[in-house]
């Protein structure tokens, strides 16, 4: 019951914090220039979050058991007698086997997340291409895919938190929760600023934000309640928390690189005055993009395990 109470509190905190972070761009009235800067900053936050927070957290979650197992025997190695060294070698060999298996998990999870979003994007765009205005169709599809990608990513986060809660280890739950919050708040901010620039009405943006904010808490509750005892044991065997986070990192990378960054490049090309040759971002926008990439990195460095 304690686990259930903690997952409820964590889910509620996640929902509120995510929604509040996303409302900030809506609450402040930006001029067109400021809105462009905020959009570029949001794009940087999405990219920096994917690379500096989600991928390392997923890898850490995968390797956690092995790392913990290795630290304990390491100090005792000096005191181990000759007869016991054979057993140690066998254990080290086993770790090597586990490492190669986990390497495969990392690549497969990331690629599957990326390919999943690619397929969702293609299926979505095939329905929209029949309209008369292909530019408007592509723009509308981009908004939907960006939101859908982040919702899928948030749902995978929820599965990771639900799987972590089912381990009954408070430290694991808190680590996963902090990791999720470190990127959900910037992602919510980035999503809303992107949708604002894309010209969506404010009410619809709020709906998109609410769906995004709800995805992780709902999935964490469903995962926690839906797992039987045997399922929990099976999930801990295959490190479901790490796999889910890496899958979500793949979806996040797709959204950040394929949709948001090119859109930001498009902003620059369409609004740049003739004197600059119509190429690239302004220095201030480049600075905002770099700052956005660095903020999650600084936050993740401050977040020690």
Swiss-Prot record:
Keywords: Cell membrane, Cytoplasm, Glycoprotein, Golgi apparatus, Ion transport, Membrane, Mitochondrion, Nucleus, Transmembrane, Transmembrane helix, Transport, Zinc, Zinc transport. Glycans are attached at residues 29, 239. The gene is SLC39A9. It is found in: Golgi apparatus, trans-Golgi network membrane; Cell membrane; Cytoplasm, Perinuclear region; Mitochondrion. GO terms for cellular component: mitochondrial membrane; mitochondrion; nucleus; perinuclear region of cytoplasm; plasma membrane; trans-Golgi network. Its main location: Golgi. This is Zinc transporter ZIP9. The keyword Cell membrane applies. It is a multi-pass membrane protein. Belongs to the ZIP transporter (TC 2.A.5) family. The keyword Mitochondrion applies. The chain crosses the membrane at residues 7-27, 35-55, 104-124, 144-164, 174-194, 208-228, 242-262, 284-304. Transports zinc ions across cell and organelle membranes into the cytoplasm and regulates intracellular zinc homeostasis. Participates in the zinc ions efflux out of the secretory compartments. Regulates intracellular zinc level, resulting in the enhancement of AKT1 and MAPK3/MAPK1 (Erk1/2) phosphorylation in response to the BCR activation. Also functions as a membrane androgen receptor that mediates, through a G protein, the non-classical androgen signaling pathway, characterized by the activation of MAPK3/MAPK1 (Erk1/2) and transcription factors CREB1 or ATF1.
